[in-house]
């Protein structure tokens, strides 16, 4: 849903046995969305770790942004990682092959990854493995993920 999701979509994902979604930006760490249909883990994203803002420039869709250099465009990703690493948190980059996958950008990512992997206490994993891990540590009482009961509002909200 490109960072947009509705109650109906969440319920459809649950009804079709999806374990997680990654469309929302409501937290820095994964949490549970609970509806009358069941539960769905949300593995949150945010624009600070998405390569679209620094590298995308598409006249076809009227998205005309200045393209940043590899170092400048990726600097925010690395700063976001450091903050999450220091806090023992969760960090997820969104790297499109046609954006960050370009040679000069990927060289910068590769150098950074080599440094990060030397730390030995960093885990890179597919989202399904991350969600499985969260379920395991929640089941044995080591962690309690936040639970959002949905819908947030049972009727339209009027401002004014």
Region locations from a protein language model:
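Active-site-adjacent pocket scaffolds in enzyme catalytic domains
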Residues: 1-87, 141-143, 159
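C-terminal domain-boundary segment and adjacent tail
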Residues: 20, 71-160
